[in-house]
Amino acid sequence: MKNILAIQSHVVFGHAGNSAAEFPMRRLGANVWPLNTVQFSNHTQYGKWTGCVMPPSHLTEIVQGIADIGQLAHCDAVLSGYLGSAEQGEHILGIVRQVKAANPQAKYFCDPVMGHPEKGCIVAPGVAEFHVRYALPASDIIAPNLIELEILSKHSVNNVDDAVQAARELIAQGPEIVLVKHLARAGYSSERFEMLLVTAQEAWHISRPLVDFGSRQPVGVGDVTSGLLLVKLLQGATLQQALEHVTAAVYEIMIATKTMQEYELQVVAAQDRIANPEHYFSATRL
């Protein structure tokens, strides 16, 4: 069984960051070690919340505690997501180095959450710059959405070919695999939700139906997507297999959420279909 140190946000109510991804990842058969960068009452798109950002040293201290009991060598991957500060990011890269020293086979999966002001997702000053300058070259796998892909590649991305090219530009700087979590306006169809999975040799495209939630889109979809992809890849799935399973599993969560008329992702209700999706979407090699 694979062990994943997941360093991202936590909400007490609802699902975002680790609170969204942790259970689905476990449902696929991974051990998740959640380390929270923030603890908030709820996700920020409600417009108000309480809670705190963890001091950067807290992250390092927790991981040192795991090292002190001799367990860090059993960590197969570090996953990072929403950061409460750029300084937290620097500490996370130190943790990645520490984990890789204990287990040279360990991977670093970076979900470079950089904020969506129009969606109410706010990140601290310096976080975007941290991802561009430091996290990108340190990562083995990176999972930007379209906006984040443009920030990381430092140019606009207007179509699928542009996205593949931009992903390969990122690969030249460090990571082996790039997941473009949401192609949005750069995709083939505005009626579909599309993703890309790219390496130096391969590029896979997949699409699924959009699920209409009106003006209140559920939060945490990207967090679940990144976490599930990491689990599948660690378990030995091919790029195609991993992309197809993750796309179907996330769709099952979206359908359950819509059917139950909920705003928060219904990861518990959808748990059996996360492991064994009823829908199937075929990835195409470009």
From Swiss-Prot:
Pathway: Cofactor metabolism; pyridoxal 5'-phosphate salvage; pyridoxal 5'-phosphate from pyridoxal: step 1/1
Top-level taxon: Bacteria
Assigned keywords, A-Z: ATP-binding, Kinase, Magnesium, Nucleotide-binding, Transferase
Binding site for substrate: 9, 44-45, 223
Main EC class the enzyme belongs to: transferase
Reactions the enzyme catalyzes: pyridoxal + ATP = pyridoxal 5'-phosphate + ADP + H(+)
The protein's Enzyme Commission number: 2.7.1.35
A Pfam cross-reference name: Phos_pyr_kin
Binding site for ATP: 111, 143, 148, 181, 208-211
GO cellular component: cytosol
GO process annotations (BP): pyridoxal 5'-phosphate salvage
Disulfide bonds: none
Any one Gene Ontology molecular-function term assigned to this protein's record: ATP binding
Cofactor field: Mg(2+)
Record-linked NCBIfam families: PRK05756.1, pyridox_kin
Quaternary structure, from the entry: Homodimer.
Family membership noted in the UniProt record: Belongs to the pyridoxine kinase family. PdxY subfamily.
Function noted in UniProt: Pyridoxal kinase involved in the salvage pathway of pyridoxal 5'-phosphate (PLP). Catalyzes the phosphorylation of pyridoxal to PLP.
Name under which the protein is recorded: Pyridoxal kinase PdxY
Organism of this sequence: Salmonella typhimurium (strain LT2 / SGSC1412 / ATCC 700720)
Gene from which this protein is expressed: pdxY
